[in-house]
UniProtKB/Swiss-Prot annotation:
Family: Belongs to the CYFIP family.
Functional summary from the UniProt entry: Component of the CYFIP1-EIF4E-FMR1 complex which binds to the mRNA cap and mediates translational repression. In the CYFIP1-EIF4E-FMR1 complex this subunit is an adapter between EIF4E and FMR1. Promotes the translation repression activity of FMR1 in brain probably by mediating its association with EIF4E and mRNA. Regulates formation of membrane ruffles and lamellipodia. Plays a role in axon outgrowth. Binds to F-actin but not to RNA. Part of the WAVE complex that regulates actin filament reorganization via its interaction with the Arp2/3 complex.
GO biological process, one term: lamellipodium assembly
Subunit (UniProt): Component of the WAVE1 complex composed of ABI2, CYFIP1 or CYFIP2, BRK1, NCKAP1 and WASF1/WAVE1. Within the complex, a heterodimer containing NCKAP1 and CYFIP1 interacts with a heterotrimer formed by WAVE1, ABI2 and BRK1. Component of the CYFIP1-EIF4E-FMR1 complex which is composed of CYFIP, EIF4E and FMR1. Interacts with FMR1 but does not bind to related proteins FXR1 or FXR2. Interaction with EIF4E stimulates FMR1 binding. Component of the WAVE2 complex composed of ABI1, CYFIP1/SRA1, NCKAP1/NAP1 (NCKAP1l/HEM1 in hematopoietic cells) and WASF2/WAVE2.
Annotated GO MF terms: actin filament binding; small GTPase binding; translation repressor activity
Naturally occurring in which organism (per UniProt): Bos taurus
Name of protein: Cytoplasmic FMR1-interacting protein 1
Keywords per UniProt: Actin-binding, Cell projection, Cell shape, Cytoplasm, Developmental protein, Differentiation, Neurogenesis, Synapse, Synaptosome
Compartments, record wording: Cytoplasm; Cytoplasm, Perinuclear region; Cell projection, Lamellipodium; Cell projection, Ruffle
A GO CC term assigned to this protein in UniProt: lamellipodium
Amino acid sequence: MYLTPSEKRINLSKVHPTDKLADQIFAYYKEGERDGKDEIIKNVPLKRIRK
């Protein structure tokens, strides 16, 4: 599924900011944004960090 940058920001905002995995996801997201890989966020297991 294709996500626009604003949709990805909404998804990332649901992640608790103090979670170390959240920082990791944000790093992957920024890396993907630099490389122009919009699909990179879908490979991150968001369910694992929801408590």
